[in-house]
Amino acid sequence: MGLSKTIPLVLLPILMFGVLSNAQLTSDFYSTTCPNVTAIARGLIERASRNDVRLTAKVMRLHFHDCFVNGCDGSVLLDAAPADGVEGEKEAFQNAGSLDGFEVIDDIKTALENVCPGVVSCADILAIAAEISVALAGGPSLDVLLGRRDGRTAIRADAVAALPLGPDSLEILTSKFSVHNLDTTDLVALSGAHTFGRVQCGVINNRLHNFSGNSGQSDPSIEPEFLQTLRRQCPQGGDLTARANLDPTSPDSFDNDYFKNLQNNRGVIESDQILFSSTGAPTVSLVNRFAENQNEFFTNFARSMIKMGNVRILTGREGEIRRDCRRVN
């Protein structure tokens, strides 16, 4: 498959706009207007994660699903409000019933509004919360840049089109990333976030029990013993909302075991395993490098997170600073 795609000319104005806007983001954006923003967010995430070991992965996923749909503008947090032109990305089938962690973002926003009202955007709260969550799980320091503003709409159909799916081919995955000026290294590094968290059985049901439309058949790329483990966790005809660990080796730690699992054909989601199973693809060597060297994975993940966090941002007078992350002002 052709993985190094030429970016269509129609996308260049969007990408150029993103580059120009990124220059307005800084690591110390709130140093005078809300200097305790990170400390406040960290305290609330630490407290919430003591009661929910999965929280850090949930928050990381929120940030990813925000940035991949029309940029990092906090739109994923908006509840559906048709009168305000908000369809709600939460209702996209990739998100419905599985996207979580909204409550801790609400708590952070409430706390910040009490000390520095109208200053910190919900989009930035997501970026800060993702940074903290990765660190709490043992991952690298991200040093996120700040200064985003919040969008005023959310479009369900855009979320359906933009977000990766479990059965996506490598070509489709690469295309979905390249739209955001994210390359193959970004694809593999960011996929490494599946080193923690869970997946609903509905996402992998066909891979385990109905692969390529063949009833009773499974994806032949799954290591046989691991297949039986997954089938016990997600039996045919079972609860599709039940969950399986994305990284069965160290499910709640941010490390490079995800890539080692791929090498052993123990990737849980088809679009994860395909990074290693696609013979001759440049993703294979990246999986091998990250499996061998955790520091190299951490370095590339941090770089890719900053890059993703700058996708089609709103700055200056664009958008707004929401008072409530769930609704527009």
UniProtKB/Swiss-Prot annotation:
Q: From what organism does this protein derive?
A: Arabidopsis thaliana
State its cofactor.
heme b; Ca(2+)
Q: Identify the gene encoding this protein.
A: PER58
Its GO biological process annotations read: hydrogen peroxide catabolic process; response to oxidative stress
Q: Where is this site: Transition state stabilizer?
A: 61
Disulphide bridges, residue numbers: 34-116, 67-72, 122-325, 201-234
Q: Any signal peptide, and if so, which residues? A: 1-23
Subcellular location, record wording: Secreted
Q: Which Gene3D superfamilies match?
A: 1.10.520.10, Peroxidase, domain 2
Stated name of the protein: Peroxidase 58
The record's similarity note reads: Belongs to the peroxidase family. Classical plant (class III) peroxidase subfamily.
Q: Which residues are glycosylated?
A: 36, 210
Q: What keywords appear on the UniProt entry?
A: Calcium, Disulfide bond, Glycoprotein, Heme, Hydrogen peroxide, Iron, Metal-binding, Oxidoreductase, Peroxidase, Secreted, Signal
Q: What does this protein do?
A: Removal of H(2)O(2), oxidation of toxic reductants, biosynthesis and degradation of lignin, suberization, auxin catabolism, response to environmental stresses such as wounding, pathogen attack and oxidative stress. These functions might be dependent on each isozyme/isoform in each plant tissue.
A Pfam family: peroxidase
